[in-house]
Amino acid sequence: LKTAFPLLALTMENMAEQLQQRFKPSNDEDIYRLTNALLNDALQQYIHRAPLTTDNGQLPQTSQMNVTLFAENLPPGPLKTAFENDFVRSKPTLREYVARLQRWRDRYEESLDRRPKRQHLEHCSHYLVEFQHQKFDEVEIPGQYLQLADNNAHFERISRFLPEYGLLRSNGMCNRRITVLSNKGARYAFAVQLPSARYCRREERIFQLLRLLNTVLERKIQTRKRGLAFNVPTAVPISPQLRLLNYDEAFVSLQDIYERHCKEIGIGKDDPIVAWVEKMRATWDGGSHSRTNVDFANLRMELMEEISVKMISDNILTNYMTRTMASPADLWLMRKQFTLQ
């Protein structure tokens, strides 16, 4: 590429360098991401040890090492002192460890959500603001070569970057969202994931599989008539630590709907998991007399039904769709379309 198209390669390298250097997460965003990683690991341990009647509830050695290493890498100050007091010096149990991580995560979520949702791009990268004047060659919109197209004759090129970028918080991470204007006037929004998750390469292979399945669905008359297709976002790896993910504001994940429901009824998003573990520990007495796998499965079903009634009702998605529709006619049309599909 550098030999055949040196100006194109130079332009792409400059653009990738700006994204990698100028869009690094702040200290608060890094702490929030790592706190979520520690909490997810702790919840897995908590769930796995729920039916063990001989469990002493102590924090695993690996978790102690991880949280100690995390505390050592924090900048000196009140934040590091408070974190060490909560997790290192006090020697918490696994239950206390989970509760304190939840409290720290919630604090950072509130702090990050108070930030302005839109920022000026010139405060972050002056090069991207003047990209249309500083580029040496035309650059195509990222991700178009992932399409199953015969040639690139119809591919769109980057005209310029919009002067504002957005701040996103989703799935335990904070990202920046940049918007690119193409030479045909279309807008493409990309979430800058830095650092990208460790499972992102596996995720990209799944995306490619779904694109192949979409071509199969498109060839079938019944699926094409119903408009059935997988919604596959475009993921473009820039470097081992950076990738661009196509972001469409028209789509909302089930996780976001669930978190909104938990906020409305005043519970934490991890409270159903904690409640399940606590009731399992209080009910499961496998040490007193022998129990079979059938008993264990029945107990799990009973606990799931109880939590479904008290915390997670079966009409969460229905309530969300009812609130977001502009009129009852829109809701009826959506239900009709879903039924036809």
Feature-to-residue mapping (PLM):
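Noncatalytic N-terminal accessory/assembly modules of large enzymes
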Residues: 1-177, 187-189
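Conserved ATP-binding subdomain of kinase catalytic cores across diverse folds
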Residues: 138-340
